[in-house]
Amino acid sequence: MSHWVVAIFCMILAVRPALADDRANLIGTWKLAGGEIEFQDTGERRPLYATDRVGYIIFTREGRMMGIIEGDERKAPQTDEDRARLLRTMVAYSGLYRLEGDKWVTAVDVAWNPAWIGTDQVRFYKLEGDRLVVNSAWAPSTNFPGKIVRVYITWTRVK
């Protein structure tokens, strides 16, 4: 029995530095390199936004994540429909984040969509040098009512 306790203790000690290393490697600014959205019901994957997508995600030493993605030929609005389209062609939120193995969880305290405030947003990630590869958990889509989707995003480190 004591061998199992020692083995588990050693595994915990090995994992803690790895999480600390990931946190140190996440800190900084990342620029959007690409993204896709996948629909659960059909398996269809399509570009996150068709054109002109831009975005950044920032992780601070203090444990805050801030992210914004825009896309699809955004222009200054002239009508209410234009204003609604601007809301549909962006995502922006921020909050304190924590690492849990291969995912980070953001406790959202400000967001472009008030429904996200007070929620935990879960993102699975993999660091590949200066690339951050991310996918979300399955969730209801804000842009495709009645659809369950997940998003795949690749970021590159800003130097």
Feature locations, PLM:
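Bacterial N-terminal signal peptides
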Residues: 4-16
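Lipid interaction determinants
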Residues: 16-159
